[in-house]
């Protein structure tokens, strides 16, 4: 590899987690730009590539037939030189509880620029800490990406929780010619507040019911006239082998705004606490009338950077994940993001996208 032609990304920027690596590699694949990522996950207790990041890296290597240096566990530097994006059926077996959704987060934007539809089957954790739950990807990410002209189908074949994992999902991706600009700035009126409270394994359904009742009670306390429908679910042994519990709540508005809030059970699971946590978070979004929630911010940056025309989102205080994503996108694409605070405290984030065109279709 020619080191002089390789763009270098500092993986320790701000939060120093995996965000810089994920976005840099995805953009490298899409744009055909070699990249070197250094100081990977420098701020984490175990710096360097984790199992999840290594699986994602090797997946992108396969998708683009890339040359890679540094693809081993705990590696702090990776050099990645992609070739063309290959549509195919890809399988990733993590053999751990590595996050399925974070692996999808790396691959989805890349497969959008393949020549034909692709399928990606991944085993690992569907609902694990420090990652979006799979329900969030289905119920919140998908409708948000529809603003950019993106379509995908995500099926959960089996749920998997920490520490054993063993979940399995299938993602089918339709390629695009280009990404439309997204305008997520008008909150509109609330149409519905809904969600799912789930438990699995040896955990009793009462935990899901506790989450449901507390979440609904909290929403009704804050908005007495607002209907809130949470479905309690106990997953069968065929659908989820091991213990796990959590809740995802969403709000849908007349302006096609979809916001999500979730909570995940840890070792000692209290359904009332989880229900309160998710409903309070969602209630805060509703009160501030943001159009993009805190966990969607960073995921939209790569699509805004690549889209044709100017994209804008109204959100809350920018997370370090989002600031990192902006930093990487600006270096990789040359676009400029504008961030302004509004009188109500919301942040308006916009950029004129690169207008990247899929030449494989």
From Swiss-Prot:
Keywords: ATP-binding, Ligase, Nucleotide-binding, Nucleus. GO terms for biological process: negative regulation of axon regeneration; RNA processing. GO terms for molecular function: ATP binding; RNA-3'-phosphate cyclase activity. Its EC number is 6.5.1.4. Pfam families: RTC, RTC_insert. The keyword Nucleus applies. The keyword Transmembrane helix does not apply. It is an enzyme of class 6 (ligase). CDD domains: RNA_Cyclase_Class_II (cd00874). It is found in: Nucleus, Nucleoplasm; Nucleus. It catalyses: a 3'-end 3'-phospho-ribonucleotide-RNA + ATP = a 3'-end 2',3'-cyclophospho-ribonucleotide-RNA + AMP + diphosphate. GO terms for cellular component: nucleoplasm; nucleus. ATP binds at residues 105, 132, 295, 298-299, 321. Belongs to the RNA 3'-terminal cyclase family. Type 1 subfamily. Catalyzes the conversion of 3'-phosphate to a 2',3'-cyclic phosphodiester at the end of RNA. The mechanism of action of the enzyme occurs in 3 steps: (A) adenylation of the enzyme by ATP; (B) transfer of adenylate to an RNA-N3'P to produce RNA-N3'PP5'A; (C) and attack of the adjacent 2'-hydroxyl on the 3'-phosphorus in the diester linkage to produce the cyclic end product. Likely functions in some aspects of cellular RNA processing. This is RNA 3'-terminal phosphate cyclase. The gene is Rtca.
């Amino acid at each position: 590899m020619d080191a002089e032609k390789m763009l270098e990304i500092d993986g320790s920027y701000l939060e120093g987690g995996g965000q810089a690596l994920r976005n840099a590699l995805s953009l490298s694949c899409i744009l055909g730009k070699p990249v070197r990522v250094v100081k990977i996950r420098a701020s984490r207790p175990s710096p360097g590539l984790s199992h999840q990041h290594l699986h994602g890296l090797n997946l992108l290597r396969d998708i683009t037939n890339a040359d890679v240096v540094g693809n081993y566990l705990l590696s702090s530097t990776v050099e990645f030189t992609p070739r063309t994006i290959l549509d195919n059926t890809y399988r990733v077996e993590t053999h751990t509880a590595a996050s399925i959704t974070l692996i999808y987060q790396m691959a989805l934007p890349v497969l959008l620029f393949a020549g034909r539809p692709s399928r990606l089957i991944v085993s690992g954790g569907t609902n694990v800490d420090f990652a979006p739950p799979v329900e969030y990807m289905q119920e919140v990410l998908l409708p948000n990406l529809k603003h950019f002209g993106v379509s995908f189908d995500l099926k959960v074949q089996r749920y998997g929780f920490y520490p054993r994992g063993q979940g399995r999902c299938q993602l089918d991706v339709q390629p695009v010619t280009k990404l439309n600009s997204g305008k997520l700035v008008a909150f509109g009126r609330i149409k519905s507040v809904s969600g799912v409270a789930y438990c699995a394994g040896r955990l009793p359904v009462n935990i899901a019911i506790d989450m449901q009742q507390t979440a609904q009670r909290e929403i009704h306390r804050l908005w007495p006239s607002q209907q809130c429908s949470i479905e309690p679910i106990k997953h069968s042994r065929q659908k989820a082998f091991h213990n796990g519990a959590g809740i995802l709540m969403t709000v849908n508005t007349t302006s096609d705004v979809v916001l999500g809030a979730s909570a995940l059970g840890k070792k000692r699971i209290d359904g009332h606490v989880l229900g309160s946590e998710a409903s309070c978070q969602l209630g805060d979004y509703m009160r501030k009338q943001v159009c993009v929630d805190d966990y969607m911010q960073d995921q939209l940056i790569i699509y805004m950077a690549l889209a044709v025309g100017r994209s804008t989102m109204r959100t809350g205080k920018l997370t370090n994940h989002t600031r990192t994503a902006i930093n990487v996108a600006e270096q990789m694409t040359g676009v400029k993001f504008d961030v302004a605070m509004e009188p109500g405290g919301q942040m308006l984030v916009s950029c004129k996208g690169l207008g990247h065109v899929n030449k494989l279709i």
